[in-house]
Amino acid sequence: MKLKEILTSIQPVKITGNQDIEITGVDIDSRQVESGHLFMAMHGTQTDGHAYIPAAVEKGATAILCEELPVELAEGVTYIQVADSEDAVGKAATTFYGNPSSKLELVGVTGTNGKTTIATLLYNTFRYFGYKVGLISTVCNYIDDEAIPTEHTTPDPITLNRLLGRMADEGCKYVFMEVSSHSIAQKRISGLKFAGGIFTNLTRDHLDYHKTVENYLKAKKKFFDDMPKNSFSLTNLDDKNGLVMTQNTKSKVYTYSLRSLSDFKGRVLESHFEGMLLDFNNHELAVQFIGKFNASNLLAVFGAAVLLGKKEEDVLVALSTLHPVAGRFDAIRSPQGYTAIVDYAHTPDALVNVLNAIHGVLEGKGKVITVVGAGGNRDKGKRPIMAKEAARASDRVIITSDNPRFEEPQDIINDMLAGLDTEDKKKTLSIADRKEAIRTACMLAEKGDVILVAGKGHENYQDIKGVKHHFDDKEVLKEIFSLTV
């Protein structure tokens, strides 16, 4: 593709050099650059891409996109100066890969909790209908049934457009994608055309990056502000920010709720550990999910599928066949008659939702033992809140290590313990070794009790000092169960 074709989607401040050259690849990582490539320099959170411009030129880059021009310009290289490289990178990548999102029905899901579940269940629903479908999520990316490992909730613009291009080339009609607040703030989705967007909820998370809840809200809201006129926005009325998200959107707004009058209205009729009986828009359905938060997630899936042209009755049949997403309220029965639940809940609100769901089924007939930690090098403010919420809704609490990253596990545990009063501490243990913490919970549990192992869900590693060590909560539980049969 000619460089001048790529530049039609952006507004350069200045161009130095030949625009008629052929570009054979686009990169934001100088290590990936080959002869004939366009290297795009961005100010990253860890490193500044501008520092790698000489290395990119050395490796054969024939064009450089940047915010600040180098002092010395290399001969035979075209330099494109832009005001906002993050925005330009997304748009340039979209153009280079042939605007793949315009060939797909791309639906984005954003919010603090529920993104993975909703995106994955939409993917499964539309595969049930017989379509080739793409999924971009925290757990894994899929091109129909081909699994592609994932690094981030939302990939960088080049990886993302390359992936969407493959999805379009391989015949996918629909793509369901988690849209993180980081990806919106960093404009990783710049240039993409969305057919629809779904808002789940907004609670405290990622304040290590956004600094304030207001900034976090603005990042989420921008996704809907930028939605095109012919798209839909489906928002959760049960969240106080639901209508705030869509107040400036050009898209058609629809609502879903378990509490209020809305376009897609739901309620929980019955709840058991085997599943729930629900009512969606005056239709009853039985599902293999537990908890009001999952009823809300399924209602969002129901609404989005209908807005994408499916009949309500057909969607209800599809929903009744679905299974919970890996690491999301993942229940395992022990030989001793207690239940262990592995869940990704890593925010105070998500933890409350899961614990409320457990109590809704138990109805006071068993104890709740919660094993929980908090991630290192992340929002420290939520640590004492996580511990407090666990203690409020549990009979016993074991504070343990999660992904400590570059912090000391005991320091994180101490931050969590600071949220507990004297009464809370009487029912709380602190065990830094996560495996030992889970084993202790199993020793404390009796028939009819529930153990919640929260925070990691689908993850099969512990991030310690920059190294990912294999660790899987569900594997650990199964191993303990097999030893105690």
UniProtKB/Swiss-Prot annotation:
Pathway: Cell wall biogenesis; peptidoglycan biosynthesis
Signal peptide: none
Coiled coil, from the record: none
Keywords: ATP-binding, Cell cycle, Cell division, Cell shape, Cell wall biogenesis/degradation, Cytoplasm, Ligase, Magnesium, Nucleotide-binding, Peptidoglycan synthesis
Pfam family, one: Mur_ligase_M
Positions of ATP binding: 111-117
A single cellular component GO annotation: cytoplasm
Enzyme class, first EC level, given as a word: ligase
EC number: 6.3.2.13
Record's protein name: UDP-N-acetylmuramoyl-L-alanyl-D-glutamate--2,6-diaminopimelate ligase
Source taxonomy: Bacteria, Pseudomonadati, Bacteroidota, Bacteroidia, Bacteroidales
Gene: murE
